[in-house]
Swiss-Prot record:
Main subcellular localisation: secreted
Assembly and oligomerization: Homodimer.
Organism annotation: Streptomyces griseoincarnatus
Protein name (record): Alkaline protease inhibitor 2C'
InterPro entries registered for this protein in UniProt: Prot_inh_I16_SSI, Prot_inh_SSI_I16_CS, Subtilisin_inhibitor, Subtilisin_inhibitor-like_sf
């Protein structure tokens, strides 16, 4: 099997160079779901459904978030099915981040 192991972090701000991570979790999906992610089973299933493409994780319908700009930066680093992953995305606030990615970003 090709390894799939990721470290996800979130912190307030817009640049990985200046953001201090406030939370971090590990997520291992191969050979089986594990790690410190609170929903490893469903997060791995959600990632597998989009082939590990974090940009393909869609926003949950019906979630209402305040229109307040308080940016948070998500970083994801590691390997997915043996391929190196280094990903950053800024969300306008934490509610917007939680509304994306179903269980993957819920940590």
């Amino acid at each position: 099997y090709a390894p799939s192991a990721l470290v996800l972090t979130v912190g307030k701000g817009v640049s990985a160079a200046t953001v201090t991570p406030e939370r971090a979790v590990t997520l291992t999906c191969a050979p089986g779901p594990s790690g410190t992610h609170p929903a490893a089973d469903s997060a791995c299933a959600d990632l597998a459904a989009v082939g590990g493409d974090l940009d393909a994780l869609t926003r949950s319908e019906g979630v209402m978030c305040p229109m307040i700009y308080d940016p948070v930066l998500l970083t994801v680093d590691g390997v997915w099915q043996g391929e190196r992953v280094s990903y950053e995305r800024v969300f306008s606030n934490e509610c917007e981040m939680n509304a994306h990615g179903s269980s993957v970003l819920a940590f």
